[in-house]
Design a protein with these regions (language model features):
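Basic, nucleic-acid-binding surfaces and adjacent catalytic neighborhoods in DNA/RNA-processing proteins
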Residues: 16-31, 41, 75, 135-280, ...
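Gly/Gly-Pro- and Ser/Thr-rich, intrinsically disordered tail segments characteristic of DNA damage-repair
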Residues: 1-106, 226, 238, 295-298, ...
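Phosphate/anion-contacting hairpin/loop surfaces
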Residues: 57-160, 164-173, 183
Length: 310
């Protein structure tokens, strides 16, 4: 999302819109033509497109949304036209948002109503000891909570998705089911910031240091393949809050490098209802969709970073 925001900012900032359509029932009558984009900012996974009339267009990509940039004459290839939710077009570029979520137009002064609940943004330019300490305090506020759930909670730290959740747990040597109290919270926060900052400006999301397809991640989307450290088969299972099973996500782990703490099993706690069973998972390249981003294609350039798994 960070890279998406930077690309949109470079394409739109300071340029008047010749076309500004919002294809959402609540916003269908809004015409942004004539407005000028003053900035495109990101906070965690939220995109904030600020306009010169004192309003902000808020959007969220979730798992399936995307913004694409096109030049005049390009064919729009980001998806079926009925999935287009926003068109912000200048004389030089068109930013087209597909399958956008939480599309809202709010006074810029009220942005905090949309993002005020978020924890420290791991890619905040002002990141330092104060924000890190805030994140540690939020992470340890519920010491018995599973680490894998706490890391994905945007109220703790903003910016971690499923890919980084899996990789952070692996690099800490901690099971996703381990209580937060059993890990070094400061180390977890520092690792999260380091990984996201290292990958912020490139479409390939690598946690291993390798950029070759198939070699970029330690455990994410590698179910059944050999652990790069110990050779054990990478496992995967459902993990989510018991009260919100519809939001369960697949978590990846090495059962040898990340042993489940004594007294806990992957079939207990937050995995109830799924029995913690191993699930089939796509290949690493397919799940991260690295080839979708940052590439100029016939018909346009994807403005977004890899699929919102990070």
């Amino acid at each position: 999302v960070f890279l998406t925001g930077r690309r949109l900012d470079e394409a739109l900032r300071g340029r008047p819109l010749v076309r500004g359509e919002l294809r959402h029932p609540a916003l269908a009558t809004e015409d942004l033509a004539g407005r000028t984009v003053t900035a495109v900012a990101t906070v965690g996974k939220h995109l904030l497109t600020r306009l010169d009339d004192g309003r902000t267009l808020h959007s969220h990509l979730r798992l399936d949304g995307s913004w694409h940039l096109y030049r005049p004459g390009d064919r729009w290839r980001g998806g079926p036209m009925h999935t287009v939710r926003a068109i912000l077009q200048t004389a030089e570029r068109a930013a087209v948002g597909y399958r956008l979520h939480d599309l809202q137009l709010v006074p810029t002064a009220h942005e905090q109503r949309l993002i005020g609940h978020l924890g420290p943004d791991l890619l905040d330019p002002a990141w330092g000891a104060e924000l890190a300490a805030n994140a540690v305090a939020r992470l340890t506020a519920r010491p018995d909570r599973e680490l894998g759930l706490a890391l994905m909670d945007q109220r703790v730290m903003a910016g971690i998705g499923n890919l980084y959740r899996a990789e952070i747990c692996f690099l800490l040597g901690a099971s996703p089911w381990a209580p937060v109290s059993t890990v070094d919270a400061a180390a977890a926060v520092e690792l999260a910031h380091t990984l996201l900052a290292r990958n912020a400006w490139r479409p390939e999301q690598s946690t291993t240091g390798e950029l070759r397809p198939g070699a970029r991640n330690w455990v994410y989307a590698r179910t059944g393949r050999a652990c790069r450290r110990c050779g054990a088969a990478i496992g995967s299972a459902w993990l989510g809050e018991p009260e919100r099973p519809e939001q369960d996500r697949v978590v990846y782990f090495c059962p040898s490098c990340q042993p489940t703490p004594p007294g806990l099993t992957r079939a207990s706690g937050s995995t109830a209802g799924r029995a913690g069973g191993t699930v089939a998972a796509p290949s690493e390249a397919g799940a991260t969709a690295d080839t979708r981003s940052g590439r100029t294609r016939r018909g346009g350039t994807a403005a977004r970073s890899p699929r919102n798994s990070g």
